[in-house]
Every structure is written in structure tokens, then in C-alpha cells.
Design a protein with these regions (language model features):
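P-loop NTPase motor domains
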Residues: 3-257, 272-274, 293
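Conserved ATP-driven motor cores of ASCE-family P-loop NTPases powering translocation/secretion/packaging/pilus
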Residues: 248-250, 254-307
């Protein structure tokens, strides 16, 4: 990988499955984010929200976080789309309400899962946060069965962050004098996210949050920041749906280089659909093919190369 080359002068955000990459890279200012370790330097989910210049921008970023937590799924059923859309409204209302009260991310997730939909919505309403209440006003008089389905969709999206002790430790709220990491850390340090191979499915939601927030940071990165940042995503299909195609089109101007590693096109098709996968591959300057077994993938790359 190019990050082993001493000529590389920038930093890197690397998803390092099983720790094979970080063990072989001697970059200075390297931070290993290991959510399985007790002494893990925590990742600050709310860093970009804290840095928002005004209340309106803060609200938008909280709404975007809700979308990252409960994204749309390709080829989802009509019922699935409904539950996800309205489950996001519940999450957004909770984030806006309880963030405004000074709660941490893990604390909000724990409270959300610890209450049924009626208790949760009543408590949010009682806080009299005008914006938060706008997101839940549509549930007044709605079918209780549908509302329960929306809450269940939201619960499933937040469960990892509310019930897994290792993840809760890795995302814990810190005092102002304690160290933590966020996408802005990449301006001075490289971050290697170590995920054991056997934990990849379990921690997939965590990876999606970190990588998606990093892309958001990159998209608004000040133009005077010219140091290169390598964005390396191993086992890419494990992240769920990211706005990667748009990032490939725009982030080069922000001095970001993206490297995506995946085992098959079929994995990408399941998440993004064929059309977006084709658009994605069309925006990579270089494609390295190490091997493929299924006929469709062989035909695709054969035509790309020119038979």
C-alpha cells in the first residue's frame, strides 16, 4: 500500500481488519482506535455537532446523524421504507432534545432503548423543545401498531451503541481535558481503526458512522488545508450504504485520496444496486483486480479492459 512508502507525506484514515495494515506501517503520529480495548481512546460522535457555527447547522448535523444511524436500504419493501423514515424522525427528535440537554451519545441511545415508544415520545414532548417536537408531531393519533414498528426499527439501529459495553466505552463522553478522536484529528494524526475479523458484522454500524462522518468532514474541509489524507476502506461492503460516489467526484479537490477494497461486485450490488455500483467504479482513477470467480464479474472487467 502507498502508505508504507516513505514518500507519502500525508495522514491516513484506515479501516484495518485484523490489524494487518497498522502492524506493517511505521507512520509517525499514528493512533490505533481499537474499540475492543479497555484503554481505547474514544471516538467523539458529537464532535462535528459541537463545532457547528450556529443552531441551524447543528440541527442539520443531528438530522444527518440520524440518517447515518438508520439509513435507507436498497430494494427495501414499502413497509420497510415507512418504518425507517419514521424511525429516523424519532431518533432525530431524541438527538435534538437530549443533545440540547447536554447528554452524551451513548446516554441518549441507552435512554431511547430503555423506554417504549409512548414513554419516549411523551418525555421528549415534556421537554418543550420546539424543533424536536416538530419531528414527532406526526405520531399524534397515528396507528399504535405502526408507531411501535417505527420505534422497533429505530431500536434496532441504536442497539449496538446502547447495549455493547465495548462500543459504549469506545464512544464514551469525555471531560474537556481527556483525549478523544474525531475526523478533524486527521489533520495532524493518522487513525487506524482496528476491527477483529470475527467482529466485523457486529461492529459494522460503528464503522459506517465513523467513515460517513469523516466524509462529511472532508467535504467541508477548508481549502487552505492542503495536506493529503488517504481514506482506505477495507471490507468496504461491511459499512452499509455510504455516499461514496459523490465523495469520489468531489473530494479529490479537498486533497483526499480514496482507496476501496472489496471482495466482490455482488456485495456492492446488494447495498448500492447495480447502477450506483457502476457509477462508483467509473469514478475510480485506478482499478486493481486480484481475482474474481463469478461469471458476471469476469464479463464486466473483461469488457472494461477491452476483451
Amino acid at each position: 500500500m502507498c502508505i508504507r512508502d516513505r514518500s507519502w507525506q500525508g495522514t491516513a484514515l484506515v479501516v484495518d481488519i485484523s490489524g494487518d495494515i497498522s502492524a506493517n506501517v511505521g507512520m509517525p503520529n499514528k493512533i490505533i482506535f481499537d474499540p475492543t480495548a479497555k484503554d481505547c481512546v474514544p471516538y467523539d460522535v458529537f464532535a462535528s455537532i459541537d463545532a457547528a457555527p450556529d443552531e441551524s447547522e447543528r440541527q442539520e448535523r443531528l438530522e444527518q446523524l440520524a440518517y447515518l444511524l438508520l439509513p435507507d436500504k436498497a430494494n427495501d419493501s414499502e413497509a420497510g421504507i415507512f418504518f425507517a423514515k419514521n424511525g429516523r424522525k424519532m431518533i432525530t427528535a431524541a438527538l435534538i432534545c437530549y443533545y440540547g440537554m447536554g447528554w452524551g451519545f451513548v446516554e441518549i441511545c441507552e435512554y431511547f432503548l430503555g423506554h417504549d415508544w409512548r414513554s419516549l415520545l411523551n418525555d421528549i414532548a415534556q421537554q418543550k423543545n420546539k424543533i424536536a417536537n416538530m419531528y414527532i408531531s406526526s405520531f399524534v393519533g397515528a396507528s399504535e401498531q405502526n408507531t411501535a414498528g417505527c420505534k422497533q426499527a429505530a431500536d434496532d439501529a441504536l442497539k449496538l451503541f446502547a447495549t455493547n459495553d465495548k462500543i459504549k466505552n469506545a464512544l464514551r463522553k469525555t471531560a474537556s481535558y481527556e483525549p478523544s478522536i474525531s475526523p478533524a484529528t486527521l489533520e495532524t494524526n493518522s487513525i487506524y481503526i482496528y476491527i477483529p475479523d470475527e467482529k466485523l458484522k457486529i461492529y459494522g454500524d460503528l464503522l459506517r458512522i465513523i467513515t460517513a462522518q469523516s466524509m462529511e468532514y472532508f467535504s467541508s474541509r477548508p481549502k487552505e488545508h492542503t495536506q493529503m489524507i488517504l481514506f482506505c476502506l477495507d471490507e468496504f461492503a461491511s459499512f452499509g450504504k455510504l455516499q461514496i460516489t459523490e465523495a469520489l467526484r468531489k473530494l479529490r479537490k479537498r486533497h483526499i485520496r480514496i482507496m476501496v477494497l472489496t471482495q466482490s461486485l455482488a456485495d456492492l450490488d446488494m447495498i448500492y444496486g447495480k447502477d450506483e455500483r457502476k457509477a462508483m467504479l467509473g469514478n475510480f482513477k485506478f482499478t486493481v483486480l486480484l481475482g474474481c470467480k463469478d461469471t458476471e464479474t469476469q464479463e464486466y472487467f473483461s469488457k472494461m479492459i477491452g476483451d
